[in-house]
């Protein structure tokens, strides 16, 4: 995996055994969850901001002006999130988030519910990404181990690897 701190591009290399990290719900037609998040760093930043904002909103009472501002932040955050997601996840996010109307000020409870819903969706997305990355790492590790074992002549074993759980001392001459 290559991460460039100057931009949101993260390259994820997958092995030949890459079927383990696809979503089972038919979304993306075989795409992995990591492929559905086009700008992971941006999504993580916005998710962290939204979570922090929700904690702040819980702690303080809101007047009309702050509720209007929070509504604007919520709508802007969703638009920005959509820019970092593949169309499949964009559609899911649109189905789950209800837009606020411009003619009335949302109540504290409405704002808290909307923010909590968005935080919950993002946390589910992050857990899915972590699971997919873990599955990729395990598949790559298994593939590397298989390549190592296949590259050695018969009877030779990788140092540190044990046969049958027993340790056998070396039988050669020591110089």
UniProtKB/Swiss-Prot annotation:
Keywords: Proteasome
GO molecular function: proteasome binding
Keyword check for Iron: no
Motif HbYX motif, residue range(s) on this chain: 173-175
Listed GO CC annotations: proteasome complex
Statement: the UniProt record of this protein carries the keyword DNA damage: no
Domain of life: Bacteria
InterPro entries: Proteasome_act
GO aspect biological process, one term: regulation of proteasomal protein catabolic process
Region (Disordered): 152-175
Subunit structure: Forms a homooligomeric, either hexameric or heptameric, ring-like structure which stacks co-axially with the proteasomal alpha-rings.
Protein's job: Interacts with the core proteasome alpha-subunit (PrcA) through its C-terminal hydrophobic-tyrosine-X motif (HbYX motif). Interaction of Bpa with the proteasome stimulates proteasomal peptidase and casein degradation activity, which suggests Bpa could play a role in the removal of non-native or damaged proteins by influencing the conformation of the proteasome complex upon interaction.
Family: Belongs to the Bpa family.
Protein name per Swiss-Prot or TrEMBL: Bacterial proteasome activator
Organism annotation: Mycolicibacterium smegmatis (strain ATCC 700084 / mc(2)155) (Mycobacterium smegmatis)
